[in-house]
Amino acid sequence: DKYGYETHTLDILDKFNPTYLTDIMEWDYKQFPPGYFYIIWASPNCKDYSALNFLSKKIKDLTESNNLILRVLEIIEYYNPKYWYMENPQTGKLKDQEFMVGLPFNDIDYCKYGYDYRKRTRIWNNNENWNGKILCKKDNYCSHRKENTKHINFRWITRGPGVVSRWEQRISIPPELMEEIIVSSV
């Protein structure tokens, strides 16, 4: 990598070409000794914690999703990396789970990192050197939002030219954000 890091990735989906193609619940993370990883980044599935899922009267069982997050926290505790990060939409219910309350975090907007939609995101982390850019709001609009207008809302786009690339962008992390975090971690 540009900064001299060897990158390992883990995902359950082959299309992301991970280093380890496995379910994190089944991954033998103790194959590496504590301290092996300098930085850990986790992007758990956001669908289960989505605020939209909680608008219906039916209560969603979060046991499986919570177990996945607890597994991530277990892995972070085992490796005790210099820096760790876990992201999820700021509007979701992950932040309300008892095991997340009290963990340090920064809220950021993806539009401040080059994307043309806002996607307010909470990043729990232990990096005191990183604060993230100021949120996009009154008196501090990004270049993608002009006064008295709104950002593009990808949630309602279902078909048409460019939708696939937009969806892939929607589930990705802005490269400018990753660059900022890595620079603050060296």
Q: Which residue stretches match the model-derived regions?
A:
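Conserved active-site and SAM-binding loop architecture
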Residues: 1-186
